[in-house]
Amino acid sequence: MTTPSMQPQWAFMHIAGQDASQYLSPGVVQFAAATDTYFSLGNKFRNPTVAPTHDVTTDRSQRLTLRIVPVDREDSQYTYKTRFQLSVGDNRVLDMASTYFDIRGRLDRGPSFKPYSGTAYNSLAPRAAPNNLMFKTGADSKTMTIAQANIVGSTIDQDGLKINNVALNPNAGEPAVQEGLENWMEELQIGADKKFASRVLKADQPVLPNYGSYAYPTNINGTQTKDGTTVDKVYMCSKGANVQNPDVVLYSEEVNLQAPDTHLLDGPGADNPKDRVAFCAAPNRPNYIGFRDNFIGLMYYNSNGNQGVLAGQASQLNAVVDLQDRNTELSYQFLLDSLYDRSRYFSLWNQAIDSYDPRVRIIENDGVEDDITSFAFDLRGIGDLPYKQVQTHNGNQQSANTTDTCYIGKGNMAAMEINIPANLWLGFLYANVAQYMPDDFKVDPSNIQMPQDKTTYAYMNQRIAPAGLIETYVNVGGRWSVDFMDTVNPFNHHRNEGLKYRSQILGNGRFVDFHIQVPQKFFAIKSLLLLPGSYTYEWSFRKDVNMVLQSSLGNDLRADGARLEIHSVNLYASFFPMAHNTASTLEAMLRNETNDQTFLDYLSSATMMFPIPAGQTQVPVSIPARNWAAFRGWSFTRIKQQETPNIGSPYDPYFKYSGSIPFLDATFYLTHTFQRVSIMFDSSVSWPGNDRLLTPNEFEIKRHIDAEGLCVGQSNMTKDWFLVQMLSNYNIGYQGFYLPENNKDRTYSFVRNFEPLARQVVDDAAAANYRDVPLSKRFNNSGWRSAGPPIFAREGAPYPANWPYPLCGEAAWAAKTQRKFLVDRYMYRIPFSSNFMSMGALTDLGQNLLYANSAHSLEMTFNVDPMQEATFLYILFEVFDCVRIHQPHRGIIEAVYLRSPFSAGNATT
């Protein structure tokens, strides 16, 4: 064995090597073993060289990783293309599975980026409370002032307020708006001779509520006076006949007033501009923005115009053959799910799966636990009525040794009651559910100019959810999803923990200098062993912010000012750390045609989309005659056209959306909208036969009326369809029903995502006195909240509620049961036997034979729930998508793609 002294002294870190017992002298090894219990050496003498320990003469094979700089780059408006020269020397093997693109650039997430809820400025203020301000009012535009004077002094003269005969200095931060009387005792004993001062905004400043108001400092002392303007003193005296001298001085100034993260809920009307002082502010909606899960959309896949290249320089044959109907991104998502627990995040590859809060998608309205009353008390607790202590019970002569004023409260301590649990629950429902309802249900704020483009953040942010639809009393006691929100993308939400994580690892600012590592996902080369030779490797990267970035609200990031710049792309790779003779043996073996490297795309599907116009309920699908040998079945779901970009295009100008992209990242949520599907091979072939509960050639998925009791699991899914899904996912069915093993119950599996729902509603046919009162006429909590959305101020009078009708207790009304289900993150599956010759109708002699050698056409008909927007039927025809990579000689790489029964055409390069 080579001794340590003969080994080269590497100048870089290694992580493996010989154990100490392999190269230390026998005496030292024996001593270490004998004394290990009380003097442990551990790996103190580990040899710092990576395996193998001999027959390696170049440091390139020993390095943990190599950086490869591009030989050419092309930075265009929509793409950034790089070309690398891969040189694999003799007796070395490059591991393409270890490669990744190291990308540096600058990201502007745009003004719509807001990575938090609420406001960062004066968040404790009431929503309609004003700043200290002066404003013009009336026909003659006279000035009115509303202010809180917080600084106490002794005298007021032409120099303003004086404290201990020293006048306040506005340039030194005086009067300080953040200071004042320090405790309630000082407030009780101010004294009639005290004078007060504070700062106030001049009348030509914008009128904004204090909640959310901000002005940046213009002085090291924290003052905010605009440069080039002066601070003027405004004197105030009490409004009385005999009052002559002012007791308040206000220091008026102009500041750079802004509302960085709030907006007004209404605007000034022409009839009474004074009301604008009492306008209510609301926080801007949170909008996390980050790269997509696994950097989906950053690299071009399945795009003819931006096809990648891996070619040997000796032959120039490209090993990358991309198909329009192959879905590399979705395949990678499913592959990861089969390997890892996707609930674990891995920042290196930006792996943080999109999720949603189940409490938002499915509302378990348990009411509120408000058994204990919550009170709010005055800071001093007791009352503040002035009294004096007297000597006896008869007469008012002041007692000796007492002050002339005492403070006595009468009766119980004054208090205000607030139902904190009910307010928290109402706030949760409004912020997490009502804010995300479809735009058709929302209204514009009054007297506010709204943008015309409904895909922008400015429009989405200012739309207001109406009252009555999402309330604490709706479906109380039930577990039910809001019907009109079942078709709203639940992953476009600020409680998407994966997106929030991906946004936060970039930081909390709009402008980001990013440095990311992006893996190769294309199945033909992502695990390839590249043998000695010179190769050209190039790929294109998108710069379209709607494709590369993801936002909580799904707004059009292009229109909202987001920008992406790529400054550099380097390739990092590793050689297998093999001894030369081992590497040469491996190379000789792989050069042999019988040892070609064969890879299978994990999804192995031909993906097809069929448009479903708004309101349509039936979708026909026709597949021309072909040989169906090696066909595995169908997976299908439904996706919105608005959320589906044109992947074949370098830049889709009609894709004005940045939320989750279901057909790329597997955030499916419309799978529950299918009612039935029929499958016909030609006209004479009966498949899947009569071995099920329902009609041959047809799968009934759900029933709205179930007179025969064919539904299952307290939902309206049929037993037949439930059986098909259990069989296709877990091979569970013939042996009874049970939960699948943990290793089969993955993120995108059936049982994990099947959510049956049931509730009761008033049976209007059995209840003669039932009235379906319109939303505007329903009231509950009248007087204690706004008649409109709960974000406005309270109004009205206390009165018995008229909604909802009671469904339990002695006063329960006659009710009927409604059932449904959700099955998000899942594609329905229909399996198909690989032995197509035994798939016909079941008889006493077995199944009828179909002939694989003859071609059959396919007719499918899908019945779906109608939706108010255009969607796609998204089908995966599950086939075998394989590639065979052959490297017969140095610098030559050949690829043969095989796909049956949906051929890839001329897939040989």
Curated annotation (Swiss-Prot):
Q: Which residues cross the membrane?
A: none
What causes induction of this gene?
A: Expressed in the late phase of the viral replicative cycle.
Query: What InterPro entries does this protein map onto?
Result: Adenovirus_Pll_hexon_C, Adenovirus_Pll_hexon_N, Adenovirus_Pll_hexon_sub2, Adenovirus_Pll_hexon_sub3, ADV_hexon, VP_dsDNA_II
Residue numbers of Phosphotyrosine PTMs: Y897
Site (described: Involved in interaction with pre-protein VI): G733
Into which family does the record put it? Belongs to the adenoviridae hexon protein family.
Q: What is this protein called?
A: Hexon protein
Q: Which organism is it from?
A: Murine adenovirus A serotype 1 (MAdV-1)
- What's the source species' lineage? Viruses, Varidnaviria, Bamfordvirae, Preplasmiviricota, Tectiliviricetes
